Amino acid sequence: MKHLLTLTDLTKNEISNILEVATQMRRIVAANYKKGPQLIGNVVAGIFPSPNLSSTAMQLATTYLSGTPCSVFGINDELGQCHTFDSMGVNTLVINCANDNLAKSFAGKSRCGVINGGSSQYDPIGVLADLMALNARLDGLQNLNVLAVGNRDVNKINELIHCLQLYGSNLIWFLPPDDFVTTRKGIVLDKAETAFAGADAVIDLGLAAFSEAEKYYGSVGGISEAFMDKARIRCPLLGSRYVVDNVGIKEYTHNIVSSRETCYVSVLMAVLYLMHKD
């Protein structure tokens, strides 16, 4: 694997291989002594708009594999910084930038490996982390109906649709009928009761600015517990730790947010290892 730009370019075998290696890497993350020798002598650089999950995971993943991390934040000339890192001889570059074309165009002529750490249309590491967390909780990714709710982190949608279809599963997206701004992709339902009914897992994408939470979640404070009750028993929830009942906001027992954060680091470790190995 030379680059990882989008999961829509990968086959089922390639995705399964990353998840399998990530499962092994998770043992390092869970261990008291978090060190593996896989990236000794390697430099992993990152370009990020500000400190975030992607930048933190890059630092941890590289350190856990005995590599050397190097990050910059808030750079105006991202492409120029990419070329600077490449000329410095870094082994891998993680790019977290809204511009979808940046990572792709740079990867076409770079000497270093390139990982898309999140852009306006794609989030390969984040989606793999979602899949890994769901795989662990649901004992596989086959024959699932996964429900996405919200309209903020829509850069996950295309890759989730692609990956779940490879495993014979479906992504269903709930959007209220009066959301005329969000571009609809895949299977979209506009009735919450129908969308949540029988869902095997729920992913909260968050809400864009000026969106009315009650129209998406059934309540102002987050996803309504009444909606979650329509899903399968012990339905896992990603993207949020909380639901809202008739009393107020409470932690949802079956949320897997913490597991997903661990999976995010593990997946990035797996990708770094596979790129170095090849």
What are these regions (language model features)?
Residues 33-135, 233, 244-247:
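Phosphate/diphosphate ligand-binding glycine-rich loop within oxidoreductases
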Residues 1-51:
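Positively charged, low-complexity intrinsically disordered leader regions
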